[in-house]
Amino acid sequence: MAKPFDISKFRKNLTKNITGISTGFNDPDTWISTGSYGLNFLISGDFYRGVPMGKVTVFAGESGAGKSYVVSGNIAKAAQDQGIFVVMIDTENALDEKWLKNINVDTSEEKMLRIGASMIDEVAKIVHDFVTDYKANHLDLPKEQRPKILFIIDSIGMLDRKSVV
């Protein structure tokens, strides 16, 4: 019989050597409604919960199916209603401030940051820099005092690599 693998030393070194890394499970404590009871239920098993904070959620579908409306509209608005700051990365340069305001999304600097980017490397750097800054300024706070941030990338499918352009 093989000797059981002892992961405790690896886990201890991992968490000691890499600041901010965690091991184990991190179940969501915050959910953001999609604005549709049916879609909420399909995603979370609950009519009132939609997408979980702290997890990656991807909406896929045909052009014109309403993905941008659900995510950039309903989910962004629901997040703002819960005090969550929205970082919206627009890869198609298609988000219209008037449209967002018409569906009650607050586009003020206090509630939302809209960034236009079209390259995978740009989006990776934006997210990396944002997370690095967030950790530097908020990681020492108790979890419940840290500001909550929602990243929306509309749309991942439109991102290009430098070598393609």
Regions found by a protein language model. Give the residues of each.
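The Walker A/P-loop phosphate-binding site
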Residues: 2-110, 122-132, 136
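Conserved ATP-binding/catalytic motifs of P-loop helicase motor domains
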Residues: 136-143
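Short acidic-hydrophobic, aromatic-tinged amphipathic segments that line or gate anion-handling sites
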Residues: 110-118
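Walker B catalytic acidic pair
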Residues: 155
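Residues immediately C-terminal
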Residues: 158
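Conserved small/polar residues in nucleotide/adenosyl-binding loops
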Residues: 164-165
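Loop/turn-to-beta-strand initiation segments
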Residues: 84-85, 146-150
